[in-house]
């Protein structure tokens, strides 16, 4: 009984510390490229500092927005190490390590040097469309071998398979190293179910910029944002206002950026946000195929929206 009490106390402290780090705004940072497809380290550093100076709480490295699907092997390690070096402990860091082969994800856990990182973001398996039990067993396997606390990521519009509310709550209850979900289903019935039924120490984080205000009103504890690559200060201010219950003030920022958010995703992400960053002089408008830049017509619309801010 004494041992169990000590364990539960330590686990509570562990999760309180995580909540302090990850309650607020995280940024799914883009990876800056040169025209030839090589990584543009100078621009990458500018974006890192831009986000940190904008007072966001943490940075997610090599998520979908970071074009992780086309960054490979040794290069991924170089990116992880570079961001950690430039960050120098200023904000919390999350490493994107996910995939549709459980064994390969576990190998990544073993081989990547994650010095300077506080957590891992792991997307649910994509393309092979496992059933709910397969999804649970995948995350259970990650939970057993992870070197860091995990944020699971549900984004069915990209993966092709929704991790249901019931499965997410089961993971939250049974996988103690998985402390949060980045929930991007856009399904408020599911979001409400998770928030209502999750353990008290499990965090729900918005994965949808345009509905973050509504998700926090329902009980979410922050956002992992694409938009905050370009507008970190205003967007993190909006999230902090929501978390403080100041929704009337938060709405002003929410509606200020609503058209900009729509434009960032209209022709795919990260195509949209990189168009904004290129206009700001933070990085070139370059990608790795099959991701491509937005049309010139849409880019002109982006320029006009920026002038209207």
Show which residues each predicted segment covers:
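Glycine-rich phosphate-binding "P-loop"
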Residues: 154-155, 177, 288-289
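Short, basic, low-complexity termini and linkers enriched in Ser/Thr/Gly/Pro
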Residues: 5-15
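Active-site beta->alpha loop and helix N-cap motifs at the rims of alpha/beta catalytic domains
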Residues: 18-160
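A general structural signal for well-ordered alpha-helical segments in protein cores
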Residues: 44, 76, 80, 105, ...
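C-terminal alpha-helical cap/extension of soluble enzyme domains
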Residues: 21-32, 50, 54-56, 65, ...
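Catalytic alpha/beta core domains of metabolic enzymes, predominantly
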Residues: 144-145, 158-265
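Alpha-helix N-capping/helix-start residues
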Residues: 35, 41, 73, 165, ...
